[in-house]
Amino acid sequence: VTGTSVIPILPDGRIVLIRRRDNGLWALPGGMVDWGEDVPTTIQRELMEETGLELVKIRRLVGVYSAPDRDPRIHSICVVAEAEVTGEMEIQDTLEASEIQAFHPNSLPTEPMSHDHARQLQDYLNDLTILA
């Protein structure tokens, strides 16, 4: 199963995270690619559903993460991209996200994150492109 994670960057440089309702952990917005969708369309849709933000452009591919244990629910392959975003933060899908917040890169939450999102974020901050 293919999914996406988005590293949304606001015009002021802050990174937007959501708190997942299912496990209470901070996470990158994202989700599964729907039948008939390409990855950029999924990124745009999931970004709007989970944050209310609009995709301006996908800046770069951060990586492809495929470890069988990266998602506790299923074996999924996650395509991670940095995205320039605009708009007002507002959760659209309240079944998936309970909170939304923007963080400066030097003040990201230190608590554990959902799935392998801490690694994805660290790879991004280290300016890496990963195939894992």
Regions picked out by a protein language model, each given a short descriptive name:
Residues 24-26, 95-132:
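Nudix hydrolase/Nudix homology domain
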